[in-house]
Amino acid sequence: MRFSKAVVRGRVAILILTVLLMIPAVFGMLETRINYDMLNYLPDDMDTVIGQNALLEDFGKGAFSFIVVENMPEKDVAALQEKLESVEHVETVLWYNSLMDTSIPMQLLPDKLYDAFNTGDATMMAVFFDTATSADETMDAIREIRSIAGKQCFVSGMSALVTDLKDLCEQEEPIYVAIAVVLACVAMMLFLDSWLIPFVFLASIGAAILLNLGSNWFMGEISYITKALSAVLQLAVTMDYSIFLWHSYNEQRAIYPDKCEAMAHAISATLTSVVGSSITTIAGFLALCFMSFTLGRDLGIVMAKGVLLGVLSCVTVLPSLILLLDKPLQKTRHRSILPKMDGLAKGVTKVFPLFLALFVVLAPVFYFAYDKTNDEVYYDMGQCLPEDMEYVIANSKLSEEFDIA
């Protein structure tokens, strides 16, 4: 109770401190680098990582891309090659004139060599960079190559995929976070007993999410998967804590007329229930840190940190906001559309052997379904990207015209 009473007494100071902490949190979030290269999360002793490091250190070649050029005269392709070679961090551009002078007709080449560069009205060149696949410099070079090459050229390769993936995530992340917030608001306004309380919850959880994203700065960088998932996951995982505090506060208000005393007891009751649950959740996320594929560590640390900040916000920021807005919250109360579940609860406890038997019967069915789902797991990121994305179009042309997947 000592902690609970301290929160109630210092509610104004807590809110002021939270607002002040938002400033460095925003800067930290903006300065945290987002990593789009899954190779960075593989163990250093894997052949792929060893090979990439050897190429970069011994030969000065890191990332590479294939460029398919359609319906362009040979002299224009040669001019394009010269322009691409001048792009910063482009180490080498390989095409026909890397082997022979363009004054010598391509048709004089042996068929096997000619077919390696040409098919129909299309020709192909390979671009090698002196930086890693997902380095910021490589992505900038990909964008510059696309702007130089024009609509007749299609840039494929892992670096092109990473560049498009970054642009797509930055474009769509605010959209699906906004959708999650709107849906959560609508659901809570309908199923809780106040029209205003969902927005109070979101303010409290939003502060915790922002602090979590800002504190990622100390990690140096996070993966794009972590960035894409963390905000929505944190919202979903910690929302229950806020609902529990609100229900506990309303129950205590019926016992204690003074709102501050009621809130102190509500915080104490919430801590008792939420701490055990949150520790289990945090432990589950931290278990990801033991994966050899260190994306698990990346996601595990960020989400464990998010749950911890969510709990702290639930028992400090949220009570302060509720006490500050107590009058409008009480005025906007309404009947919940959810019916009482007492009858259902009693019914379930009476026939619980039936549910146990049902579980035993269905478990093998769902295990079989799970096993079949594992057969369909894919690891090609290109399969989950929109068909009109530049990388997907370029990769399709490379596969169809040059039989390079």
Question: How does the language model describe each region?
Answer:
Residues D45, V49-I50, K75-T131, T163-D167:
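Extracytoplasmic
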Residues A79-V90, A141-C153, K397, E401:
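Generic non-transmembrane alpha-helical segments
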Residues V69-N71, N97-L99, G157-S159, L362:
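A general secondary-structure junction signal
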Residues F64-E70, T123-F128:
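Active-site-flanking beta-strand signature of metal-NTP-handling nucleotidyl enzymes
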